[in-house]
Amino acid sequence: MSNKLVLVLNCGSSSLKFAVIDAQTGDDQISGLAECFGLEDSRIKWKINGEKHESSLGAFTAHREAVEFIVNKILAGQPELAAQIQAVGHRIVHGGEKFTRSVIIDEHVIKGIEECSSLAPLHNPAHLIGIRAAIASFPKLPQVAVFDTAFHQSMPERAYIYALPYKLYREHGIRRYGMHGTSHLFVSREAAKVLNKPLEETNVICAHLGNGASVTAVKGGKSVDTSMGLTPLEGLVMGTRCGDLDPSIIYHLVHQLGYTLEEVNNLMNKQSGLLGISELTNDCRGIEEGYADGHKGATLALEIFCYRLAKYIASYTVPLGRLDAVVFTGGIGENSDIIREKVLNMLQIFNFHVDSERNKAARFGKKGIITTDNSTVAMVIPTNEEWVIAEDSIKLITK
């Protein structure tokens, strides 16, 4: 067994994903999810060596109790494995401009994450709860923070500054930050290996497609533009998020239709996207089923989703100058051969030609090139953010 194991924690507002990852291979020794925090039926599910387990956490429990269960029940039952854990790695959604790389957590870092909470009010406070719970449960282990925004700190000003009064950036930090950076970092690195090119000479466009979705232009291993902005709302059509729209729509909804700002925020984040257009579901699998059955709303939602994505991919050839490959990842990107084919068919001007057999084969965790031999390359690479977090954690504690 490797002596480079890391416990990776990803704390949401009402859930906690966890895994024990081998930083050398990326394999998970344990993985699980605690959910429904604050409710009567808080539960935890986990898998060890392929064997599934489930338990109640008790009514109205939360992150602290979940971490204690992981320590006292799950890891206590695997003492040999637990003894090999070298660090706890935390996924942090927003590091603002304060954090350009992963860091070992101390009080200064905790304060910095707190100061970025206004930029990610649903996520950063939950991450802080998880950090404090982990410190209490693992007082002797180093804790490491890995930021979703850090990868995008290499963007030039022309990509991240909004055309608003500059003082809003200077005084309040209002700018494009981007998300999914850990995923885009991983798949762009893996894409260079598939292409058999040095990372420094590889230009790819990565599409991380899930309930949240973003596109990033990666030039020589560095992010040079990305579709999400100050928050995860900007950019692509998503499961329940609207993505790009005319900002005056907000004014119209408030002053002409009587919405409150809170209602508009909720509408754009939780009632829009695939769900809002289809009036059916936010789940892409349900959208594809509706499309196959001829459901008008599902068909329109799918077409808009693919069209917006294709436009972004096309536009990101501008900062790259030369395109080596388009990479699909995330739950939708890895599994929807329908969406991949539709998007690439819209991009035939760039000489994309889908190989139907390869495209259908690249699903359920299988990676590979999905275009014909004479085509510009498009590929599927399953993301592994936990591996990046584990790798960064080991690198930092062994410096």
UniProtKB/Swiss-Prot annotation:
Q: Which residues form the active site?
A: 148 (proton donor/acceptor)
The record, for Pfam families, names: Acetate_kinase
Q: Name the top EC class.
A: transferase
Q: Which GO terms describe its molecular function?
A: acetate kinase activity; ATP binding; magnesium ion binding
**Residues involved in ATP binding:** 17, 208-212, 283-285, 331-335
Q: Which InterPro entries match?
A: Ac/propionate_kinase (IPR004372), Aliphatic_acid_kin_short-chain (IPR000890), Aliphatic_acid_kinase_CS (IPR023865), ATPase_NBD (IPR043129)
Q: Where does Mg(2+) bind?
A: 10, 385
Swiss-Prot/TrEMBL cofactor(s): Mg(2+); Mn(2+)
Q: Name one GO cellular component term.
A: cytosol
Q: Which UniProt keywords apply?
A: ATP-binding, Cytoplasm, Kinase, Magnesium, Metal-binding, Nucleotide-binding, Transferase
Which compartments does it reside in? Cytoplasm
Which reactions appear under catalytic activity for this entry? Answer: acetate + ATP = acetyl phosphate + ADP
Keyword Mitochondrion carried by entry = no
Q: Where is this site: Transition state stabilizer?
A: 180, 241
**Pathway as given in its UniProt record:** Metabolic intermediate biosynthesis; acetyl-CoA biosynthesis; acetyl-CoA from acetate: step 1/2
**Cofactor: binding comment:** Mg(2+). Can also accept Mn(2+).
Taxonomic superkingdom: Bacteria
Keyword Kinase attributed: yes
Binding positions (substrate): 91
The subunit field of the Swiss-Prot or TrEMBL record says: Homodimer.
Function of the molecule: Catalyzes the formation of acetyl phosphate from acetate and ATP. Can also catalyze the reverse reaction.
> What is the protein name for this chain?
Acetate kinase
Q: What species was this sequence derived from?
A: Shewanella sp. (strain ANA-3)
Upper lineage is: Bacteria, Pseudomonadati, Pseudomonadota, Gammaproteobacteria, Alteromonadales
